From Swiss-Prot:
<keyword id="KW-0030">Aminoacyl-tRNA synthetase</keyword>
<feature type="binding site">
    <location>
        <position position="133"/>
    </location>
    <ligand>
        <name>L-tryptophan</name>
    </ligand>
</feature>
<feature type="short sequence motif" description="'HIGH' region">
    <location>
        <begin position="11"/>
        <end position="19"/>
    </location>
</feature>
<dbReference type="InterPro" id="IPR014729">
    <property type="entry name" value="Rossmann-like_a/b/a_fold"/>
</dbReference>
<dbReference type="GO" id="GO:0005829">
    <property type="term" value="C:cytosol"/>
</dbReference>
<feature type="binding site">
    <location>
        <begin position="18"/>
        <end position="19"/>
    </location>
    <ligand>
        <name>ATP</name>
    </ligand>
</feature>
<dbReference type="GO" id="GO:0006436">
    <property type="term" value="P:tryptophanyl-tRNA aminoacylation"/>
</dbReference>
<comment type="function">
    <text>Catalyzes the attachment of tryptophan to tRNA(Trp).</text>
</comment>
<dbReference type="InterPro" id="IPR002306">
    <property type="entry name" value="Trp-tRNA-ligase"/>
</dbReference>
<dbReference type="InterPro" id="IPR050203">
    <property type="entry name" value="Trp-tRNA_synthetase"/>
</dbReference>
<dbReference type="InterPro" id="IPR002305">
    <property type="entry name" value="aa-tRNA-synth_Ic"/>
</dbReference>
<dbReference type="InterPro" id="IPR024109">
    <property type="entry name" value="Trp-tRNA-ligase_bac-type"/>
</dbReference>
<dbReference type="GO" id="GO:0004830">
    <property type="term" value="F:tryptophan-tRNA ligase activity"/>
</dbReference>
<protein>
    <recommendedName>
        <fullName>Tryptophan--tRNA ligase</fullName>
        <ecNumber>6.1.1.2</ecNumber>
    </recommendedName>
</protein>
<feature type="binding site">
    <location>
        <begin position="145"/>
        <end position="147"/>
    </location>
    <ligand>
        <name>ATP</name>
    </ligand>
</feature>
<keyword id="KW-0436">Ligase</keyword>
<feature type="binding site">
    <location>
        <begin position="10"/>
        <end position="12"/>
    </location>
    <ligand>
        <name>ATP</name>
    </ligand>
</feature>
Length: 331
């Protein structure tokens, strides 16, 4: 039996090269080896204010991007979170098994609520919903960035607590972080992560950026004054970030890239890297726009929601029986 992978991405903001390298690029590779569930987590998105029309547009756009990067709907299950009711139902059960102190200690809650007067309860209870997303599918592996590890640890705690207290039904998920490229940094401030929500658009390369924009952003990426192309995260964070991008896209080791550019300057390196990124993203963009115009996209999402619901409802029923909700049903 194949191990199960679950991954969810919010439909808020444009996806970046960091999202692609950290997660999306691996999705096509996973589906031959694992049973994969890829979820567009629109219920997570509404923990902060959203424009309803824009949210729906971004949800459909993200689905098209998932397919454009290589997801095969015959091998993977692609669906929208809100179209599978079990997610919200399971989240409530888990919310009743988590402590407020655990939620308040979450770094993401602290960061997003800092200095704000009106913070939604949904932002605080985000982790139980994320745990439900993962646990409903008896997930073995969760591909996440370093910044999400704390949430996975809480998910494991909740699974263990529920298994001991109510019913032993959950698989214990493990974090899966690619060795290289899991954390792509900002182009202008390489001490912080590249983010799709960054106000400075120069900090990120977006997957739908035109080639000219990609070249301009990489050309203006922060480096240093030494002119030597070598990986040193502490002393040369900008160049190290660009080397990481180069390595993940080409599959070459960083050492071999360093050797290739001995005696060459940042200009040559950035020019070559820009062309590599453009070559990587152009075919994705072509497939994206084709899916966006096609009725096939909705057919795929309908089928994905149906399959996801069948799997999730089995786990939800066990959860309900475990805590004594409703009548004990055979079907």
């Amino acid at each position: 039996m194949k191990k199960v992978i679950f991954s969810g991405i919010q439909p808020s903001g444009q996806l970046t090269l960091g999202n692609y390298i950290g997660a999306l690029k691996q999705f096509g590779q996973f589906q031959d080896e694992y049973e994969c569930f890829y979820c567009i987590v629109d219920e997570h998105a509404i923990t902060v204010p959203q424009d309803r029309l824009k949210l729906r547009e971004q949800t459909r756009s993200l689905a098209a991007l998932y397919l454009a990067v290589g997801l095969d709907p015959e091998k993977s299950t692609l669906f929208i979170q809100s179209e599978v009711a079990a997610h919200a139902q399971a989240a409530w059960i888990l919310q009743c098994n988590v402590y407020i102190g655990e939620l308040e200690r979450m770094t993401q809650f602290k960061d997003k609520s800092a200095g704000k007067a009106g913070v939604s309860a949904g932002l605080l209870t985000y982790p139980p919903l994320m745990a439900a997303d993962i646990l409903l599918y008896q997930t073995d592996l969760v591909p996440v960035g370093e910044d999400q590890k704390q949430h996975i640890e809480l998910t494991r705690d909740l699974a263990e607590r529920f298994n001991k207290k109510h019913a032993d039904i959950f698989t214990m998920p493990e974090v899966f972080i690619p060795k290289q490229g899991a954390r792509v940094m900002s182009l202008q401030d390489p001490t912080k992560k590249m983010s799709k929500s960054d106000a400075n658009l120069k900090n990120a390369i977006f997957l739908l950026d035109p080639p000219a924009t990609i070249r301009k952003k990489i050309k203006s990426a922060v480096t240093d004054s030494s002119g030597i192309i070598e990986y040193n995260k502490e002393e040369k964070p900008g160049v190290s970030n660009l080397l990481t991008i180069y390595s993940v896209i080409t599959g070459e080791t960083i050492a071999s890239i360093e050797e290739k550019y001995v005696g060459k300057g940042y200009g040559d390196f950035k020019t070559d890297l820009a062309e590599l990124v453009v070559s990587e993203l152009e075919p994705i963009q072509e497939r994206y726009y084709a899916y966006l115009k096609s009725e096939e996209l909705d057919t795929i999402l309908d089928a994905g929601a149906e399959k996801a619901a069948r799997v999730a409802n089995k786990t939800l029923k066990k959860m309900e029986n475990g805590v004594g909700l409703g009548r004990k049903r055979r079907k």
